Amino acid sequence: MLEKLMEVENKYEKITQTLSDPKVFSNKDEYMKYSREQAELEPIVTKFREYKRILKQIEEAEEMIKSGDPDLKELAEEELQQLKKIKPQIEQELKVLLLPKDPRDEKNVILEIRAGTGGEEAALFAANLFRMYAKYAESKGWKVEIIDSHPTGLGGFKEIIATISGKGAFSKLKYESGVHRVQRIPVTEASGRIHTSTATVAVLPEAEEVDIKIDEKDLRIDTFCSSGPGGQSVNTAYSAVRIVHIPTGIIVQCQDERSQIKNREKAMKVLRARLLEIERQKKEAERAAERKGQVGTGERSERIRTYNFPQNRVTDHRIGLTLYKLEQVLNGNIDEIIDALISYYQAEKLKEM
């Protein structure tokens, strides 16, 4: 690890030198490129320099103990004890900082939520989940835009698709893919029995045009009048867009905007994200040995979390985390869950190093 850290520090120092070169400073693109590289390496270098200071202080404390002065020895032993506690903590932090970065982490998100088993109750739960993620995004200063939705009469959603744009959106939300389960007494239930319903969540990184090429010849594009709950037409203009990707059979549609052009752009965003996910899963299947290390990959059969209303409980089954603060969680306070998931999967990756 030390060798790797020294390499990173040398690279950082070279980049810092390069940034002070007037030629680079006057070239905006070059300057931005090196500044980004420097910013990426800075946390590792800062932590490594802290680690080197700790090693030096340990060495000095050990020298003091050997010196034979009783007063100095007592002080040095106390300091050494403290330093030896700090050292493994910093080593762990450095290991985490050296983990390979997921290139998708800085991407915006395409969020897809679909009602699963449970009829109207599942649709209401899908709406609860969408509100939870929208509130969480708002707390982070991210932007949420609905691309397509299929509302039900009671305020639920059979399906809702949205983009979430903001720094680090995918890195935080990528472990939310999977089956979410709710246990509660439905508003439609007269006998007061607890029902179990589900909704599936898919979190995809938004794909740029450079990430995936789509041949226009492979697309069939239909336009239609947008509709509201129950299927009634709410717009006489043919502004809604449905795109069929012929080779894969993927169908996406968008009717959220009044403009056909904007609806087409949004639908293409979803199509690109889904095609990129297919590519990723294909590569993942080819590397079967790595599959264990891939988490939250959107396996729809995987039940990841239960929201139990009578017990005010949320349980994430992957990491065995249980919180008794359901209302706060559904109001978007999910940092505790997300941070625990990130820490867990970082630890899993460290085992593989």
From Swiss-Prot:
Sorted UniProt keywords: Cytoplasm, Methylation, Protein biosynthesis
NCBIfam families: prfA, PRK00591.1
Function statement: Peptide chain release factor 1 directs the termination of translation in response to the peptide chain termination codons UAG and UAA.
Posttranslational modification: Methylated by PrmC. Methylation increases the termination efficiency of RF1.
UniProt xrefs under Pfam families: PCRF, RF-1
Source species taxonomy: Bacteria, Pseudomonadati, Nitrospirota, Thermodesulfovibrionia, Thermodesulfovibrionales
InterPro entries according to UniProt: PCRF, Pep_chain_release_fac_I, Pep_chain_release_fac_I_sf, Prokaryotic/Mito_RF, RF-1
Organism: Thermodesulfovibrio yellowstonii (strain ATCC 51303 / DSM 11347 / YP87)
Compartments, as annotated in UniProt: Cytoplasm
Keyword Cytoplasm assigned: yes
One Gene Ontology cellular component annotation held by this UniProt entry: cytoplasm
Family, similarity comment: Belongs to the prokaryotic/mitochondrial release factor family.
Protein name in the entry: Peptide chain release factor 1
Modified residues (N5-methylglutamine): 232
GO molecular function: translation release factor activity, codon specific
UniProt-listed PANTHER family: LD18447P (PTHR43804:SF7)
